[in-house]
């Protein structure tokens, strides 16, 4: 196994210390007041739901998945088009209909917030059969409910990948949300026939001036690796702070045998 930590010279890098000014973990077990769920399919068969249950599976009752193991656990938002399309993906494709749908928050007040970071945890599995031109898991941000800035949060996860741990997503949405009184968030499954998307622990925070996030290991799989002396370890870092990083910093990787690898960036 591999544990990667990160030190930023002269600055503090601690994502958990950020203070959120808005958060929703769905612990009430129902859709929050003022939120909306929209099914954009022609047959109106697919809708986001608030649930604490697993994805029940499809295609001869296979492809099941447990509920997202988010920080808050329990209730979360779940979209499960695979249950509806099942073995009839070809028929859906022939009639040019995708099981698209989204949920949207009520207005969030971001006045006085010069920088805004959207954080959430999600778990998904997708099928690349007959995907549409705008296929993706899209998070939209708007300050008027009409015009949207969208981010595809599939994170280049290959089709049919079974994720076991939630993806911790962080997006700096300051260009749309900073100092705006009516900010809306939208989570939109678009132009993919199956399987599911689970979302939980959505929050808005103010970023530190200098703050780096370690997104993922890019040279190897996240788990189950055996490293040799010839291996080159590569990771993807993301600046989620409000200011550019203009100082060198050190990335340290700790192997489970106690060995440490370091690199200056």
Task: Name each model-derived stretch.
Residues 153-156, 199-265:
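Extracellular/luminal regions of secreted and cell-surface proteins that mediate adhesion/ECM remodeling
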Residues 96-102, 130-132, 190-207:
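Extracellular carbohydrate recognition
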Residues 157-204:
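Terminal, low-complexity interaction segments
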Residues 1-21, 206:
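Bacterial Sec-dependent N-terminal signal peptides
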Residues 90-113, 167-170:
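Short beta-strands within extracellular/lumenal beta-sheet-rich domains
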